[in-house]
Amino acid sequence: MAASAGCYYGVLGCALSLLLLPPLSRCAARTDSPLPEELPLILGFRLERSDRHAALSPDGELEVVEGSRLELRVYGLHLREDSGHILAFTEYSPGSQDNRSCLEDSRDLVLTRLNVSDDGFGAAGAAIVRLDVLPLRKSQSSRVYVLCTSRGPGLPWKLHTGPDGRLRVLEEEKPLLPIWLQACIIAVLLTLSGIFSGLNLGLMALDPMELRVVQRCGTEKEKRYASKIEPVRRKGNYLLCSLLLGNVLVNTTLTALLDELIGSGLAAVLASTTGIVVLGEIVPQALCSRHGLAVGANTLWLTRIFMLLTFPVAYPVSRLLDCALGQEIGTVYNREKLLEMLKVTEPYSGIVREEMNIIQGALELRTKTVEDVMTKVEDCFMLPSDAVLDFNTMSSIMESGYTRIPVYENERSNIVDILYVKDLAFVDPDDCTPLSTITRFYSHPLHFVFSDTKLDAVLEEFKKGKSHLAIVQKVNSEGEGDPFYEVMGLVTLEDVIEEIIKSEILDESDLYTDNRSKKRVKRRQDRKDFSVFKDADNELRVKISPQLLLAAHRFLSTEVPLFAPALVSEKTLLRLLKYPDVVQELHFNEDDKKASENFLYQRSKIADYFILILQGKVEVEAGKENMKFESGAFSYYGVMAINTPSAAELRSPSHMSSLNRSISLSCHERSDSISSTISGSNTQLSAQAQYMADFSVRALGDLQFVKITREQYQGALMSSRLDSSPQSPEGGTRKPDSTLSERSEVLEDETTSLLNQRNSQHSLQHNAV
């Protein structure tokens, strides 16, 4: 506080006042003649300390509150401890003619102590006066007191009526509300300040797009919260204005209450700052930044109330913001930002690597062209238009594994047609049908795309069902002459899908894992190689089609136990079938049907060979009753003739295959029942292990059959053992795995009864036919 000094002395008094008084000092009375030096002289005072509010008025008066305890610093000369009697205050009414004199000092201001201190002037020049201000009377709101001073007892008193000598006592302002109620209101305001601050961050941070996403794919609780918040959040600027206006209003009211409750000064500043910053900003914003959805949904009723209360101010401002800034759309990610967001949040989103690859491939689909994923024309499997659909060509098609094969004419870049593998369902390789005949008949349309076509456009074309294979071409304008279309390669639906899933799709026919890296696929061990069945010059004396050779090989390997892969390897069996004189033909003698050359087996004659009928029909006569029946292709005889006696288990002269069972049901029942009962006995084998047939097999027409002798079969067994089992250091070989368990001998009387039973069934079936 500061106060101007009023000078009531001459030149000496003013000089002393300028030298001795600080800014808040008051000048005392002036005199016309110098005073004795030994008498005390009071020059002025200033406020040193007050336990309640005190201030200077605009007129320079010192204003204090009733009930205050003041400490005044008094300045003067020759002050002593007993100088308190020369200082007094009396009531003063400005503008009144009849004011009280200094002798009538006021009892409302009680002087309790005077402490004198030496300030270095050679005499005591300052003193501390403690002054107690008593409460005002009920009818008064303020009262003015003036300073009265004297030089000593019996000397006159001087009344200081200037502003610097006046002291105004004001009525203490009592709060409108009790302190406990103010504390409660402050607590509520702090809570509201925190709510508004938190909602301002929590609700405004909830993007409208994000709320729509949560409504569709969040948890049930999140969906419920988002459904509540989304209508309010849609009014973004209105919500923002309401929250900010409410926050400012609450903080302003809170500051005013704290100032009234605590008082002005550093304490009020620290209290309001601490309460608003810590409880109204930091804590709620930290909470709402992580749980804004739940907090916003549970306090939505309060938000709506404040939006309604602040409507007259907030709504017009929000409309101005809408017009100036436009409608709030929300955060929208483009393809690149969305992909990067997924990559950054991958450790926390629970998306596995394979799913991330699929998402990345789908997002990058529109950025890649056909040229990036196509198979170059030189790496494509194609067929020339003049090809013939024989066994070799069909085998190449089957080995390639492709279902759609381009057909070119003259050069590979000139693709004129396309062949579907399903078109070959009714094509017989023996017919050697020209490829052009099949392609002209089906006439599949060709689908061309340019090399710069995006993969999403190609995928849409493939989805229409026109074709799953497209020919990639470009316009070649290099060199002289007119531009022309140049074929660059092929693209399939599989290529597009591989780019989407970011992984290679390998099937059993793929040769490379990637068309660009040319990394070969590890060949499967069980993959069938049909090239070994192709025709070779001078390899077979009797002409047999490759497909029939393949069928015979499969039948012997799977249906005849003696030729099972455990005994005879498939490679050895194939070499055996290609051995000279194994596949033979018999031309039927029409003139003499009973001629010996028409018989494959004759009763009671030694036979050391196995026969498999490939084409034609034979008549089998077996049993004591000479029962006869006919058999066709893929029936076999003489299993015991090539087998050793100890391993003999199949003694039927005729065994019908599953290939022959589809001819007719009656034929199946007849042949199967007969073949299961015709058997020999161990007495048929001589001591030299010779086999004597107890049945006859006679041709009924031209035949083509496989004939394997015992010597050839034993050689095949030995070759298979050498191929599958390395020799031991002692030179021995591992014994073959006996997968065929030896069966007990079938007694002759049991065989006879079975033959009689089958005989009667055959007679009934024959009569029915």
From Swiss-Prot:
What keywords would UniProt list here? CBS domain, Cell membrane, Glycoprotein, Ion transport, Membrane, Repeat, Transmembrane, Transmembrane helix, Transport
Q: What is this protein called?
A: Metal transporter CNNM4
The chain's Cytoplasmic topological domains, given as residue ranges, are 197-237, 259-261, 314-769
Record's keyword annotation contains Repeat = yes
BP GO annotations? magnesium ion homeostasis; monoatomic ion transport
Question: Which InterPro entries does the entry link to?
Answer: ACDP, CBS_dom, CBS_dom_sf, CNNM, Ion_transp-like_CBS
- Tell me where the transmembrane regions lie: 176-196, 262-282, 293-313
Name the principal localization, coarsely classed.
membrane
Q: Which residues lie on this side of the membrane: Extracellular?
A: 1-175, 283-292
* Annotated Polar residues bias: 721-730, 752-769
Kindly list every residue the record annotates as glycosylated.
Answer: N99, N115
Q: Which residues lie within the membrane without crossing it?
A: 238-258
The chain positions of domain CBS read: 374-435, 442-508
Described by its record, this protein's role is as follows: Probable metal transporter.
Region (Disordered) spans which residues? 717-769
- Which GO terms of the cellular component aspect does the record hold? plasma membrane
Q: Where in the cell is it found?
A: Cell membrane
| Residue ranges occupied by any CNNM transmembrane domain in the UniProt entry | 175-355
Organism in which the protein naturally occurs? Xenopus tropicalis
